[in-house]
């Protein structure tokens, strides 16, 4: 029997997958209970080893960063030279954290001044630190999380929820995204009540996928995959929920839209859900601001009134532009190890 006729729930089972599941579950469970200082260092170490030995993946990261740098330099040219205050802020930031060379309080304009090889290594190390630390953050109490994760833009979430149509949250692969399940809890500390859901792609290991899904749902999250179809996630949004969608994934098909000045097939899902539900869209980004310290930023996604919302390409471009700004705010926190362009 050909593999495409076997249900995914059966195709990704078997002894080898079970062994992988036991190992992965053991690692995740360990990361959830270890001190975050240790998991952060372990993650950076794992990232360094990956950078050292994964030569083909380094080439992928290099190509992605070259495209991002070109885009950032173009934005920098449009914005003009940095002010004296911005330059002082950049120097202060660079001296306070050696592992966050890609960040700058003055925005994105200074990023490309660092050597490309330094950027490539930092992408690997931050990817490891963000992944490992994300599991630790996901199991902390809200009070503990606030010591490590700062949220900016909650006022935009509050304003969006007041419209009564739910919220669509545009996500990119960046930062400690496993900590996203803490967003509703942290928002509640500021008087904002919201249920969080997310679109997700099932893992190629049924055992680990089921366990990880149970873990996330135990935190109150609602998870939707392609087997849930179109209506369930839209109904969730309409009921007042906030649905997170990873919108920067590489697509085989989809409307072509500019992404860092490269025309790429783009996921139509955020735009389709926005058109169907009328829910406002917010974009979320992460930035490492110090060792074991992150900033999560929420920004409203806006577009001119004359935009044709019946056009999937127009909606895809709007979403890509929002993702560009978030990723460019801290490029080394982006997960650039997949062939996006």
Regions found by a protein language model. Give the residues of each.
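Membrane-anchoring hydrophobic helices of lipid-metabolizing enzymes
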Residues: 2-88, 102-103, 107-168, 176, ...
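A conditional alpha-helix N-cap/helix-loop micro-motif detector
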Residues: 147-150, 205, 223-226, 263-264, ...
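Glycine-centered loop/turn motif at secondary-structure junctions
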Residues: 69, 73, 164, 188-193, ...
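Catalytic core of membrane glycerolipid acyltransferases/transacylases, capturing the structured
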Residues: 122, 130, 163-227, 252-255, ...
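Active-site metal-coordination segments of metallo-dependent hydrolases
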Residues: 58, 202-206, 264-267
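Non-catalytic C-terminal accessory region of glycerolipid acyltransferases
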Residues: 2, 6, 11, 50-53, ...
């Amino acid at each position: 029997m050909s593999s495409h006729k076997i249900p995914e729930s059966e195709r990704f089972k078997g002894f080898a997958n079970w062994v992988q599941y036991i190992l992965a579950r053991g690692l995740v469970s360990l990361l959830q209970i270890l001190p975050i200082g240790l998991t952060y260092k372990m993650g950076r170490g794992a990232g360094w080893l990956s950078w050292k030995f994964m030569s083909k993946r380094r080439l992928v990261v290099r190509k992605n960063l070259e495209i991002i740098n070109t885009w950032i330099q173009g934005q920098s040219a449009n914005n003009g030279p940095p002010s004296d205050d911005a330059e002082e802020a950049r120097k202060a930031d660079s001296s306070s954290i050696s592992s966050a060379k890609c960040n700058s309080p003055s925005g994105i304009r200074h990023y490309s001044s660092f050597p490309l090889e330094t950027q490539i290594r930092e992408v690997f190390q931050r990817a490891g630190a963000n992944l490992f630390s994300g599991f630790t953050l996901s199991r902390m109490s809200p009070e503990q999380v606030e010591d490590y994760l700062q949220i900016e833009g909650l006022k935009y979430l509050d304003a969006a929820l007041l419209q009564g149509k739910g919220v669509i949250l545009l996500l990119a692969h960046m930062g400690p995204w496993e900590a996203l399940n803490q967003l509703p809890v942290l928002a509640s500390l500021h008087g904002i009540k919201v249920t969080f859901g997310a679109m997700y792609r099932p893992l190629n290991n049924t055992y680990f996928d089921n366990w990880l899904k149970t873990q996330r749902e135990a935190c109150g999250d609602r998870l939707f995959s392609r087997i849930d179809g179109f209506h369930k996630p839209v109904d969730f949004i309409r009921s007042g929920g906030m649905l997170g969608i990873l919108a920067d994934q590489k697509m085989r098909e989809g409307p072509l839209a500019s992404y860092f000045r490269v025309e790429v097939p783009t996921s139509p899902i955020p735009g389709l859900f926005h058109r169907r539900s009328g829910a406002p869209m917010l974009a979320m980004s992460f930035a490492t601001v110090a060792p074991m310290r992150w900033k999560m930023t929420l920004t409203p996604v806006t577009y001119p009134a004359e935009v044709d919302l019946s056009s999937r390409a127009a909606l895809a471009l709007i979403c890509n532009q929002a993702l560009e700004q978030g990723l460019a705010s801290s490029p080394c926190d982006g997960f650039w190890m997949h062939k996006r362009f």
